[in-house]
């Protein structure tokens, strides 16, 4: 059995670790609330752009944007959204497992894949498996800025427009609630027709027409690009909210485990100390009897 000094050292070490995990839990909880707010604020913009684009597309059916053109899929672009940091449970593992499964499916059909990494963990993973990475952005910080993302996103959008890829997929972690996050792999391009289809309610709400400057085609082109960029930004915002939630839960679990370990070590310490005292008393009694 370990001595009391060794056990005290272990207790001190675990206590220090628990202080760190507890602090990280509190920081993650604070960042999670801010990340959720950013995520909620991003949704109305994307939805408003979609509504206007849908209205313009229905008013100008003769115009077909390249983002809506279906082609035989021989080459695919994959945008992989992960975190820059670890200590967030199985968040990155789950989404990268979904990406791996999708890559195996595509490669099994003879489809070439080129990837864009958003987040350091995704970049490390893609480099490790030897994937073709055409663009990346890392170190986004706690607040994602669209201007940091546009350069990496544009590489895939231009590749689709120029016919270099026939589809673009987006993988990220969708935020469900604090305790649940879901890995997603969705088709970003070509845009599904139902995404730009107006409901009856939207048709009534957008029953007017616009005066276009310079012309309807240019406006629709710009709007659809902004819409796709907004979808990627929304995915990054959801991923960040998921990251902070997962980190808070992981650090709470670590703090709870540390508390249990401290309790067990304290019990061992008490037993060891009691055994040492009992031994000393026995030696004193034996010595007194001998005299």
Curated annotation (Swiss-Prot):
It is found in: Cell inner membrane. Gene3D superfamilies: 3.40.1380.10, ATP synthase, gamma subunit, helix hairpin domain (1.10.287.80). InterPro entries: ATP_synth_F1_ATPase_gsu, ATP_synth_F1_gsu, ATP_synth_F1_gsu_CS. GO terms for molecular function: ATP binding; proton-transporting ATP synthase activity, rotational mechanism. It is a peripheral membrane protein. One of its GO terms (cellular component) is proton-transporting ATP synthase complex. One of its GO terms (biological process) is proton motive force-driven plasma membrane ATP synthesis. Keywords: ATP synthesis, Cell inner membrane, Cell membrane, CF(1), Hydrogen ion transport, Ion transport, Membrane, Transport. Belongs to the ATPase gamma chain family. Produces ATP from ADP in the presence of a proton gradient across the membrane. The gamma chain is believed to be important in regulating ATPase activity and the flow of protons through the CF(0) complex. HAMAP family: ATP_synth_gamma_bact (MF_00815). F-type ATPases have 2 components, CF(1) - the catalytic core - and CF(0) - the membrane proton channel. CF(1) has five subunits: alpha(3), beta(3), gamma(1), delta(1), epsilon(1). CF(0) has three main subunits: a, b and c. This is ATP synthase gamma chain. It comes from Cupriavidus pinatubonensis (strain JMP 134 / LMG 1197) (Cupriavidus necator (strain JMP 134)). The lineage of its organism: Bacteria, Pseudomonadati, Pseudomonadota, Betaproteobacteria, Burkholderiales.
């Amino acid at each position: 059995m370990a001595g009391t000094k060794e056990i005290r050292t272990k207790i001190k070490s675990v206590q220090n670790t628990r202080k760190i995990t507890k602090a990280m839990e509190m920081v993650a909880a604070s960042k999670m609330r801010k990340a959720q707010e950013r995520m909620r604020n991003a949704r109305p913009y994307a939805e408003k752009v979609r509504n206007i684009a849908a209205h313009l597309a229905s008013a100008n059916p003769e115009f077909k944007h390249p983002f809506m053109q279906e082609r035989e899929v021989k080459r695919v672009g994959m945008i992989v959204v992960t975190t820059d940091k670890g200590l967030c449970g199985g968040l990155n593992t789950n989404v990268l497992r979904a990406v791996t499964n999708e890559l195996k499916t595509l490669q099994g059909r003879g489809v070439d894949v080129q990837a864009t990494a958003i987040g350091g963990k995704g970049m490390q993973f893609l480099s490790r498996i030897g994937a073709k990475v055409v663009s990346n952005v890392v170190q986004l910080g706690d607040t994602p800025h669209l201007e940091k993302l546009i350069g990496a996103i544009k590489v895939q959008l231009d590749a689709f427009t120029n016919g270099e890829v026939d589809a673009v997929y987006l993988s990220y972690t969708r935020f469900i609630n604090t305790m649940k996050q879901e890995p997603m792999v969705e088709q970003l391009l070509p845009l599904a027709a139902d995404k730009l289809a107006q409901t009856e309610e939207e048709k009534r709400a957008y029953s007017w027409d616009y005066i276009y400057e310079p012309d309807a085609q240019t406006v629709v082109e710009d709007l659809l690009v902004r819409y796709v960029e907004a979808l990627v930004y929304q995915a990054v915002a959801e991923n960040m909210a998921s990251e902070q939630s997962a980190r808070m839960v992981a650090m709470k679990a670590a703090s709870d485990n540390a508390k249990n370990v401290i309790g067990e070590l304290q019990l061992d310490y008490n037993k060891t100390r009691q055994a040492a005292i009992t031994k000393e008393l026995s030696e004193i009694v034996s010595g007194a009897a001998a005299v």
